[in-house]
């Protein structure tokens, strides 16, 4: 146990940072591919976090297996947040991923990055980060709309979102994000069994 803790607390090496960067790029692509269908539809856009969480689980878990040290997941969240922001997403979308990546880092770290259950929970929490923009939308729809209009979103898209939004959609958004990311984490654990055994990751 002491060896695992010492390994976790060691600083990130150049190799770790490069690996984190590569997997962050892959993760971004998988989240984008999973969520883009929903994002382009103002009625279905609330389920973008669910779509984004459906495919990326194996990539996320493999990153943990490759770099099981503190701050790798946080750095991933910073990079993804920056990418989302500069590509025109609402600032809360970027901030949501950043905050939840840090939370996810500490959750996975609680098991020294060796627990399948905590690593999977970590991924679920990370995926919930995609709800950040929508939380702000429900909390301050007018402010959200002004920001997105400034980012180039069409008024008709926003009008349809506002007409669709209700408490049921908000609950369904969170439930769907949790369910799809849990499925993705489960599939990832099955796909990466050999890699997990090599990295010492257990139940």
Model-derived features: where do they sit?
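Short, charged juxtamembrane terminal tails flanking transmembrane helices
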Residues: 1-7, 193-203
């Amino acid at each position: 146990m002491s060896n695992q803790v010492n390994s976790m607390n060691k600083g990130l090496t150049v190799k770790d940072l490069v690996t984190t960067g590569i997997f962050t790029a892959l993760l971004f692509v998988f989240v984008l591919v999973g969520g883009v269908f929903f994002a382009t539809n103002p009625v279905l856009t609330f389920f973008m976090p669910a779509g984004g969480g459906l495919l990326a689980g194996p990539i996320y878990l493999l990153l943990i297996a490759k770099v099981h040290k503190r701050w790798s997941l946080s750095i991933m969240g910073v990079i993804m947040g920056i990418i989302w922001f500069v590509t025109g997403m609402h600032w809360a979308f970027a901030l949501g991923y950043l905050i939840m990546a840090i939370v996810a880092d500490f959750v996975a770290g609680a098991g020294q990055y060796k627990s399948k259950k905590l690593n999977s929970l970590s991924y679920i929490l990370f995926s919930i980060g995609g709800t950040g923009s929508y939380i702000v939308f429900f909390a301050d729809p007018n402010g959200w709309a002004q920001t997105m209009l400034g980012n180039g979103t069409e008024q008709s898209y926003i009008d349809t979102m506002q007409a669709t939004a209700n408490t049921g959609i908000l609950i369904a958004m969170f439930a769907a994000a949790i369910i799809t990311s849990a499925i993705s984490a489960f599939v990832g654990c099955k796909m990466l069994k050999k890699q997990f055994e090599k990295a010492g990751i257990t139940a």
